[in-house]
Amino acid sequence: MRAYLRPLSFLYDQVVGVKNNLYDRGVFGVFKAPVPVVSIGNLTVGGTGKTPITDFCLKSLVADGKKVAVISRSYRADASAPCLVDVDHPFAARYFGDEPVLLAQANPQVSVYVGPSKWRTARYAVEKHKYDLLIVDDGFQHRRLHRDLNIVILDATESLSNYEVLPEGRARESWAGIERADVLILSKCNLAPEDELKALEARLPKNKEVLYFGYEIQQCQNVKTGQVLHRDELKGKKLFLVSAIARPDVFEKMMREIGEVSNQSLHFRDHHQYTADDVKNIENAFKKSQADYLVTTGKDAVKLRQLFNDTAILWSTSLEVAESGRKGRLHEIITQVLR
């Protein structure tokens, strides 16, 4: 099947290549913000673990006393103009987007802005307030906005064949685009088979600094009551999973390290907007599975919280990332653009 898609991938790659070439030659205009801009992005269409890395960076910058704003796109959301995310909005996830709301909830000292165009949203943010730094969420391909640092995340669990250009693979542009990156991050390294990790490393440009991050679920929190269960308390328990993320297989793999995952678990398409009917189907499937716990991701919890408002059966995972090797190196790299 993939071979039949190759001609379409070739055409797509040519179009993207022309666009990038025009940006490289300065034909297209670029907005340069009055403060440093750091992009955290990827080559593929999603599921690299970008949001946890962004959250990791925000927490380290806030701890260092920096005033930071996040620039994101209102993907599959209702916001039609640049605006500041309001976590108290009655339908926050639907209006602003699940990932922006998740980042805003986890980092109350950070301003998170969304809009249909990242460069316009960045302009809106710096016109409203003074910041030390802008973090552009998923900004690698958005070249209309100048950035001072390009961080690209590569999923260590991703098959190398998926780095073929869309629609044959999952890449938004060819592997050659990685040369625009200043720093590469290999995510989920602890979840990747050693041979696959080595194959990915062998393909990386030799002139790029590479950082390694591991991902682990340490606990679950009840969405309604706030009760926390450590991973050790879930050992031997049957877990029914529900998610709408790009890589549900990775979510399942992490949960299998904790408990027994039900084979009746439900996974929707990435960024799916849940409905009341979805919740009824989830509840019915959960009951039929006879699982002990109904577990979802943090990103999904921001959308499901209100829909499960009358019951305390839903639990949200807490994903932690750990920097391997030289601790604090990513923070050091980012703060260098402030000097």
From Swiss-Prot:
UniProt-annotated binding residues for ATP: 44-51
Entry GO MF terms: ATP binding; tetraacyldisaccharide 4'-kinase activity
Superkingdom: Bacteria
Pathway involvement of the protein, from the record: Glycolipid biosynthesis; lipid IV(A) biosynthesis; lipid IV(A) from (3R)-3-hydroxytetradecanoyl-[acyl-carrier-protein] and UDP-N-acetyl-alpha-D-glucosamine: step 6/6
Keyword Lipid biosynthesis: yes
Gene Ontology CC entries for this record: plasma membrane
Keywords: ATP-binding, Kinase, Lipid A biosynthesis, Lipid biosynthesis, Lipid metabolism, Nucleotide-binding, Transferase
Catalytic activity: a lipid A disaccharide + ATP = a lipid IVA + ADP + H(+)
EC number assigned by the record: 2.7.1.130
One GO term (biological process): lipid A biosynthetic process
Cited NCBIfam families: lpxK
Family to which this protein belongs: Belongs to the LpxK family.
Entry function: Transfers the gamma-phosphate of ATP to the 4'-position of a tetraacyldisaccharide 1-phosphate intermediate (termed DS-1-P) to form tetraacyldisaccharide 1,4'-bis-phosphate (lipid IVA).
Protein name, per record: Tetraacyldisaccharide 4'-kinase
Lineage: Bacteria, Pseudomonadati, Bdellovibrionota, Bdellovibrionia, Bdellovibrionales
Gene: lpxK
